[in-house]
């Protein structure tokens, strides 16, 4: 896989993840509105349980989409590090991406714990 293909795959992954993130953020808002309506209208216990389950599922899925952002960056850094180790010439941007995203030849592991602090760190290195 070439450097351009790695960046293209990262771009596609981030675009798709952003769409899912926006959708789940909206559904999380809907869950919040549904909860407030259920509380204000003195809804039954079944409705409150259904709204709570819907809200928890929406929150989990939103967190999952945020976790895929980090995983996408780690996977791209891993692919660039493997490309570098294979002897291919990389651009200065690719080398700085490997450094900024802690790229290594070890395969990244998916984690459900997104790191918002690392997002700001990555954004600072983009400029």
Regions found by a protein language model. Give the residues of each.
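Membrane-interface segments at the starts/ends of alpha-helical transmembrane spans
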Residues: 3-12, 102-116
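Helix N-terminus capping/helix-initiation residues
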Residues: 44, 115-119
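Hydrophobic alpha-helical transmembrane segments of multipass integral membrane proteins
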Residues: 20-27, 52-62, 122
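Membrane-interface helix-boundary motifs at transmembrane edges
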Residues: 35-44
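Inner-leaflet juxtamembrane helices
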Residues: 47-89
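Short membrane-interface loop/juxtamembrane segments of multi-pass integral membrane proteins
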Residues: 82-113
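Conserved small/polar residues in nucleotide/adenosyl-binding loops
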Residues: 120-127
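Cytosolic-side membrane-entry/anchor segment at the start of a transmembrane helix
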Residues: 1-32
